[in-house]
Regions:
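Subtilisin-like serine protease catalytic core
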Residues: 108-231, 245-248, 276-277, 292-294, ...
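Inhibitory N-terminal propeptides of secreted protease zymogens
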Residues: 1-90
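Short, solvent-exposed loop/turn and secondary-structure capping segments
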Residues: 10, 73, 82, 90-95, ...
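Glycine-rich, histidine-containing beta strand-loop boundary motifs that form or position
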Residues: 63, 72, 81-84, 121-123, ...
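Substrate-binding/access-modulating region of protease and related hydrolase catalytic domains
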Residues: 117, 204, 219-321, 327-336, ...
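N-terminal domain-start motif of subtilase-like serine proteases
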Residues: 49-51, 60-72, 90-140, 178-193, ...
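Stable alpha-helical elements in mature extracytoplasmic
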Residues: 24-27, 31-35, 64-67, 105, ...
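Second-shell loop/turn segments in exported
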Residues: 20-26, 56-58, 109-111, 183-188, ...
Length: 422
């Protein structure tokens, strides 16, 4: 909308509680009210979801796409565009905090006193398992108390529904938790990605320690429980509240490698710049698509030799205001192994079940070499309570021996388990 933005002033947090802020807010509210009145009288099926004041003066509405131009032409409307949708940045491999934090020097920073004490990080993600033991310990010198959050709710300056402090304040570790996607305070029902990210940032238990174990975490759920993407409208609402609440940093492990239309991207870039101007460190994932050929139809994830391509970086991490954070593979990983004498041999269990049967063996077994696992390879061999050691590939009766057939033959011969090697 056409009008001044509160974030144009020097200190956003201080300004928001001043008399000047109240005066500006009334002017901004009148501008939004005029536009809302026109939306209601000139268009059908329009619902206002959010009103923004801090990072920009505007509205988020649900309307028919056919009415976009009509909305753009309304008096007082500077621009209107369709909300962009971002996807999660999924990890390329499983990581363990015990190894990943030291891999980036997090343990060194903690030893020098940088533990996140007195700091608050807003995590815009899929939510959090609030009962997880990694977030149960009390915070040393928390920045926000329960009363602080209650005061913010009472000021009616947040973009949350009709909630009370009892439902939104989880603990001094998690002083704020809200689901912007579903407009409620249940942040525990989504993908575990958010809990994983929150653990990296601020886990603090006897088992795992994050980069900033003494930091408070504001959990701002912006993804649906079904894995659907995060909309700009919800993201901006969460960013507004992060500014109003006074977060020191914002973490967003989301992005879109291909980017968006120039008009929408320009407006979003301005919003992120104002968040930075408010003194907040804005950290966004660079993404894991090292090339625009990643997950392409070619099936190799590699570019053509005739078109070698360049690395691809996800938006919004490409905005000037954001610190683009690239991923790195963990230098260590835990893996199951078989112990043969003093030698540890890694293995992979391809079973698609939550409980791996091989783990239930828990004993010492003799192994017997059984060729490629054809029926004839078991002739004359005693396999009761023993493990069949079978080579990959091979044929039987002119047919290629599948893993399933090898296992079937071994079971018929009385084997306790099967190990297939290449």
């Amino acid at each position: 909308l056409d009008s001044h933005k509160v974030s144009q002033y020097a200190s956003v947090t201080d300004f928001l509680v001043s008399s000047a802020a109240q005066s500006s807010e009334r002017k901004l509210e009148r501008a939004r009210k005029a536009v809302k009145s026109q939306l209601a009288t000139k268009l059908d099926d329009v619902e206002v979801r959010y009103e923004y004041t801090t990072v920009f003066n505007g509205l988020s509405v649900e309307a028919n796409y056919a009415d976009l131009e009509a909305i753009q032409d309304l008096p007082g409307v500077k621009d209107a565009y369709v909300s962009q949708v971002y996807q999660l940045i999924e990890p390329v491999n499983e990581t363990k905090l015990a190894d990943s934090v030291p891999a980036i020097g997090g343990d060194i920073s903690q030893k020098t006193g940088y533990t996140g004490k007195g700091m608050v990080v807003a995590i815009l993600d899929t939510g959090l398992d609030t009962s997880h033991e990694a977030f149960r310990n009390a915070v040393n010198a928390p920045k926000f108390t329960k009363q602080d959050i209650a005061d913010k709710l009472a000021s009616d300056s947040l973009r949350v529904g009709n909630v009370n402090v009892k439902s939104i304040y989880q603990s001094d570790k998690i002083p704020f938790a809200y689901d912007y996607y579903d407009d409620d305070t249940n942040v525990s029902g989504g993908n575990s990605h958010g809990t994983h990210v929150a653990g990296i940032v601020g886990a603090n238990s006897g088992q795992v320690t994050g980069v900033a174990p003494d930091a408070q975490l504001m959990i701002m759920k912006i993804f649906g429980d079904d894995g659907s993407g995060a909309y700009d409208s919800d993201i901006i609402a969460a960013l507004e509240d992060a500014v109003v609440l006074g977060a020191d940093a914002v973490n967003m492990s989301l992005g879109m490698t291909a980017g968006f239309s120039e008009a929408a991207a320009t407006k979003t870039r301005e919003v992120y710049q104002r968040v930075k101007n408010a003194g907040i460190s804005l950290m966004c994932a660079a993404g894991n698509e090292y090339s625009s050929s990643y997950k392409s139809a070619g099936g190799t994830d590699l570019p053509l030799a005739s078109n070698p391509d360049n690395g691809a970086v996800a938006s919004p991490s490409t905005y000037d205001a954001a610190l683009s954070v690239a991923s790195m593979n963990n230098v260590k990983a835990t893996a199951p192994y078989l112990l043969v004498g003093d030698r540890k041999i890694r293995y992979s269990d391809p079973a698609e079940t939550a409980s791996k049967q091989i783990a239930s063996l828990n004993d010492t077994y003799e192994y017997v070499a059984c060729g490629v696992g054809a029926t004839s390879d078991f002739t004359g061999k005693t396999l009761t309570y023993k493990v069949a050691l079978i080579q990959r590939a091979g044929e039987e009766n002119g047919e290629i021996l599948s893993f399933a057939q090898k296992e079937k033959n071994a079971k018929a011969a009385g084997a306790k388990a099967v190990i297939i090697y290449d």
